[in-house]
């Protein structure tokens, strides 16, 4: 059984223009062959579908949205499922949530990780594919999109809840994949806490863990013979001028057979200045990609070095945030050093 997983998809700016005129092949032409060769293909829908006037929720950061054509494009590209546990799913409130679910289902796409309440949002997706039973668990870190008993939104990352979800999934399936939307935006390594959490998911039965959210790709590791991918990067997310890290990513294909999980990484560029489509890397570019991934993997395997890289990144990026944080809070941060603003274990 071959399962393909892609990262963050948000049809905006130039991509939105192409999709609204129905030029899906310009964006996904090189990807469709990959999805068509897979038994099941999954992508993260990083924005709600909003077809009617809707009020934005109060939050920090941009409010993202697309039309139903953004979902139709995914179906054309060969995807079977979208993950909805992310920090933008609730950007336009419950109206956006219900319209997103309706658009996905009318296009024949499965959904996981989001719903009209926490019961629906936290539900594991089960699929029978070529005689194999696959379970997909999707969750995200807490920001502005989390569902509860009475409100729509995304399934939150909660280690206790995911523990029970994995245990239950393994009773009902042959393979369980956990897809998490988390990490530090624009930082190309996982925190040590992420590593600890995702390894725990493997320990309790997950056959693979896949992460996205950071807007840049990260490395991976094999833990107890199971793969953990710490960041796929943007799949299609226009942001011209944002740099190579923003425009680089990879698709992962998981091949399940017996107790083995083999995988392939398919690197690409997306939304460059001269090409808004997803373009697979050429041979010389793939060599550079492999070198970068190997360096990330080396750092991930060394907790001390990984934490050092994280703290260095915090020091370099703290400046822009200091101007928007309450000065009194900053004084408390200084008093509490060396925990830093974004602490990790």
Regions found by a protein language model. Name each.
Residues 12-14, 49-52, 87-101, 118-123, ...:
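Active-site environment of divalent metal-dependent phosphoester hydrolases
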Residues 53-75, 175-207:
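Active-site-proximal segments of metal-dependent phosphoesterases and phosphodiesterases across multiple
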Residues 14-29, 64, 128-176, 196, ...:
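Binuclear metal-dependent hydrolase catalytic cores centered on His/Asp/Glu-rich metal-binding motifs
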Residues 333-345:
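Single conserved hydrophobic/aromatic residue that forms the stacking wall/gate
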Residues 38-50, 86-87, 169-189:
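Short acidic, glycine-rich surface-loop motifs adjacent to enzyme active sites
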Residues 78-81, 191-251:
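Conserved beta-sheet core of the metallophosphoesterase superfamily
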Residues 122-136, 227-296:
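Binuclear metal-dependent phosphoesterase catalytic core
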Residues 1-85, 93:
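N-terminal catalytic scaffold of extracellular/periplasmic and nuclease hydrolases
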């Amino acid at each position: 059984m071959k399962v393909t997983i892609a990262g963050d998809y948000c049809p905006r700016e130039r991509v939105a223009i192409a999709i609204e005129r129905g030029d899906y092949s310009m964006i996904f032409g090189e990807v469709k062959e990959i999805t068509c060769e897979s038994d099941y293909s999954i992508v993260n829908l990083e924005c709600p579908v909003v077809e009617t006037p809707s009020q934005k929720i109060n939050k920090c950061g941009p409010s993202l949205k697309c039309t139903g054509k953004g979902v139709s494009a995914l179906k054309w590209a060969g995807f079977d499922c979208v993950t909805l546990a992310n920090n933008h799913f609730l950007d336009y409130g419950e109206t956006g949530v219900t319209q997103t679910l309706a658009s996905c289902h009318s296009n024949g796409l499965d959904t996981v990780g989001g719903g009209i309440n926490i019961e629906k949002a936290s539900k594991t997706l089960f699929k029978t594919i070529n005689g194999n039973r696959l379970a997909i668990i999707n969750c995200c870190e807490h920001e502005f999109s989390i569902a509860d008993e009475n409100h729509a939104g995304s399934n939150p990352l909660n280690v206790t809840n995911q523990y029970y979800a994995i245990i239950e999934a393994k009773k009902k399936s042959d393979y369980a994949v956990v897809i998490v939307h988390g990490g530090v935006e624009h930082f190309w390594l996982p925190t040590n806490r992420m590593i600890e959490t995702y390894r725990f998911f493997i320990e309790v039965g997950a056959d693979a863990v896949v992460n996205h959210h950071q807007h840049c790709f990260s490395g991976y590791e094999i833990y107890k013979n199971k793969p953990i991918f710490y960041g796929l990067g943007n799949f299609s997310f226009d942001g011209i001028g944002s740099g190579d890290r923003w425009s680089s990513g990879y698709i992962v294909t998981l091949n399940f057979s017996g107790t083995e999980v083999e995988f392939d990484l398919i690197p690409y560029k997306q939304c460059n200045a001269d090409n808004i489509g997803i373009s697979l890397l050429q041979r010389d570019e793939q060599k550079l990609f492999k070198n970068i991934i190997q360096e990330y993997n080396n750092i991930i395997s060394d907790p001390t070095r990984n934490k050092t890289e994280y703290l260095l990144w915090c020091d370099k990026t703290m400046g822009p945030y200091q101007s928007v944080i309450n000065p009194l809070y900053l004084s408390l941060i200084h008093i509490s050093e060396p925990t830093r603003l974004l602490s990790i274990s």
